[in-house]
Amino acid sequence: DQTAITYPFTTVTSMTGEMIKTILEDVCDNLFNPDPYLQQGGDMVRVGGLTYACEPSARMGSRISDMRLKGQPIGAAKTYRVAGWAPVAEGVKGEPIWDVVETWLKSRKRVTPRRLNLPRLIGVEGNPGIAV
């Protein structure tokens, strides 16, 4: 549902809910670390089917909450199959994303836009550096 054609290989990985939260927390810390020298920039992970809340001013480990898949809470110990296009493990290679997208588009007679899954931001009202 949501992708960027910037990294070539697609992957499918098994991850626990706790692992997913840890990854989102780490990416969030790259953006919102209170020490500007540790802010690495970038953007939050684009996710399909997953919704969550993000509180940028909270401490590392407490920024991500209310993670849900298709409206149901994510279980910390439950394992989920996660598809991606930017492998996080060394030596992982899958089919190039542009081939996956091409196959998917060809299999449909009509493609309609879907609602983007954007994180719900908490505590950013009045912050001119964060666009909501």
Which residue stretches match the model-derived regions?
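Feature captures C-terminal
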Residues: 1-132
